[in-house]
């Protein structure tokens, strides 16, 4: 249900861009390319890949825990991201697998291992494999949306993402209902409904920057932002289950260093 709410909100937010004449022109241009078969329809399925990630997250986090989920997801994103950049699948400039980028990928993964909570209990391989595919789905979402951006613009790409994702999530919920799974639980907290707005920002930024930054750098920067924000929130709103200690701070610092390495700054 959270995924559906997020996609509805994102669709509404991104629909506002259609009031801009330039966005409508770009959308018509893309439609023309599709009609001429100069742009394959499957490249519009970035939102479906995003829905795969959301559905996998909602069904595996409670089984393997947030810590292990995050580590496996980030590792999968990093490996797939560096390969996508290598072969230029996002329609951006190809980026060689240099020792610096490889080191950044490894540091980024290690940083997440440091900052997440320790995993306790039996390792369940089926959910872990599912999370690996979820990481691949996130990379695929960024890649496909970047390809749409190349032939239109980031607003059109982000707008297409949400209806596609909403369709996939709705279909998943219908199937769950057929198998007797109850999903009709609406959140009580009003602020949870802001997820669609925040998701729209992330998808838009990804569509606008991935072709330039590359999938690896965008992924590392996104995780770095999440880690820093989570530390700030944990300090401002302390949680008994979370300890902002040396490991978490050092891990966040390592992640920022990984972003620096991947950015090729001198």
Predicted regions and their residues:
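Membrane-interface helix termini and inter-helical loops of multi-pass transporters
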Residues: 1, 28-30, 59-60, 113-126, ...
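Glycine-/small-residue-enriched transmembrane alpha-helix faces in small-molecule transporters
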Residues: 1, 52, 56, 103, ...
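Transmembrane alpha-helices of multi-pass small-molecule transport proteins
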Residues: 1-49, 107, 137-139, 158-178, ...
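Structural signature of hydrophobic alpha-helical transmembrane segments
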Residues: 1-12, 59-79, 123-137, 184-199, ...
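Alpha-helical transmembrane segments of compact multi-pass small-molecule transporters, enriched
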Residues: 9-12, 72-87, 164-171, 221-237, ...
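Loop-to-transmembrane-helix transition segments
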Residues: 27-52, 126-132, 182-201
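Helix-helix packing/entry segments at the starts of transmembrane helices
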Residues: 67-76, 149-164, 200-234
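Juxtamembrane helix-loop boundary signature in multi-pass membrane transporters
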Residues: 82-133, 243, 249-266
